[in-house]
């Protein structure tokens, strides 16, 4: 088992069978000791965050499997903090796809002249480049196509999958009286036919969720959902 990548919140290992093993860490993204799913650096370490992220990821990926939504997930071992996944080809140097139900975070920083904090959004989907140096800039459908990162047809598939997946997560959270404000997803091409599938994770570390108007920390979110 060889280390192929050490990430902000996970390490990636290549397995002998050609699949990969993701090792979840207790680091979360943020700035100045404050959690922020949109941040480009590790902001703090939260004991138990890795296993909490994996428990939610396992829950949601298995839920998506029931809905026949393609993902890279194979299986997981929560006690060891590991998840076995299929190999995936990312788009360009990596894309992040955000689905927004309320105006917060970077949306407000960009559109605060027109938007109100917490304003309801209709599952607004936007794509950003994974580019720390340029602070993950948003990119349009046409630009993705013209730069050879994603075809127009692939963009439509990506957007449709994002809305479906985000809707499922939103519904699961609402069963616990929790409101999903936004969620960040990643996709890649998998298997011989290179179909688009969800990759990475779905956890408290890549979403903002609120209960009774109060923000829920990632570890608390896992406890509320899994209980």
Swiss-Prot record:
<comment type="similarity">
    <text>Belongs to the SAICAR synthetase family.</text>
</comment>
<keyword id="KW-0547">Nucleotide-binding</keyword>
<dbReference type="InterPro" id="IPR050089">
    <property type="entry name" value="SAICAR_synthetase"/>
</dbReference>
<dbReference type="GO" id="GO:0005524">
    <property type="term" value="F:ATP binding"/>
</dbReference>
<keyword id="KW-0658">Purine biosynthesis</keyword>
<protein>
    <recommendedName>
        <fullName>Phosphoribosylaminoimidazole-succinocarboxamide synthase</fullName>
        <ecNumber>6.3.2.6</ecNumber>
    </recommendedName>
</protein>
<keyword id="KW-0067">ATP-binding</keyword>
<keyword id="KW-0436">Ligase</keyword>
<dbReference type="GO" id="GO:0006189">
    <property type="term" value="P:'de novo' IMP biosynthetic process"/>
</dbReference>
<dbReference type="Pfam" id="PF01259">
    <property type="entry name" value="SAICAR_synt"/>
</dbReference>
<comment type="pathway">
    <text>Purine metabolism; IMP biosynthesis via de novo pathway; 5-amino-1-(5-phospho-D-ribosyl)imidazole-4-carboxamide from 5-amino-1-(5-phospho-D-ribosyl)imidazole-4-carboxylate: step 1/2.</text>
</comment>
<dbReference type="GO" id="GO:0004639">
    <property type="term" value="F:phosphoribosylaminoimidazolesuccinocarboxamide synthase activity"/>
</dbReference>
<dbReference type="InterPro" id="IPR028923">
    <property type="entry name" value="SAICAR_synt/ADE2_N"/>
</dbReference>
């Amino acid at each position: 088992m060889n280390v192929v990548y050490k990430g902000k919140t996970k390490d990636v290992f290549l397995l002998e069978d050609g699949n990969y093993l993701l090792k979840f860490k207790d680091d979360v993204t943020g700035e100045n000791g404050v959690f922020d799913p949109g941040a480009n650096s590790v902001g703090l370490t939260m004991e138990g965050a890795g296993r909490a992220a994996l428990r939610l990821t396992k829950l949601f990926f298995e839920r998506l499997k029931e809905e026949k939504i393609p993902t890279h997930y194979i299986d997981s071992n929560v006690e060891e903090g590991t998840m076995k996944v299929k190999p995936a080809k990312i788009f360009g140097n990596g894309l992040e796809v955000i689905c927004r139900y309320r105006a917060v975070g970077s949306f407000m920083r960009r559109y605060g002249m027109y938007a109100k904090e917490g304003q309801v959004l209709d599952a607004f989907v936007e794509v950003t480049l994974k580019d720390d140096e340029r602070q993950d800039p948003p990119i349009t459908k046409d630009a993705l196509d013209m730069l050879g990162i994603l075809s127009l047809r692939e963009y439509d598939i990506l957007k449709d999958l994002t809305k479906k997946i985000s809707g499922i997560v939103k519904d699961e959270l609402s069963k616990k009286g929790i409101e999903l404000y936004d969620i960040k997803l990643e996709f890649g091409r998998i298997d011989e036919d290179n179909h688009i599938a969800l990759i990475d994770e779905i956890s408290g570390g890549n979403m903002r969720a609120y209960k009774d108007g109060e923000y829920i920390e990632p570890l608390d979110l896992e406890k509320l959902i899994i209980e």
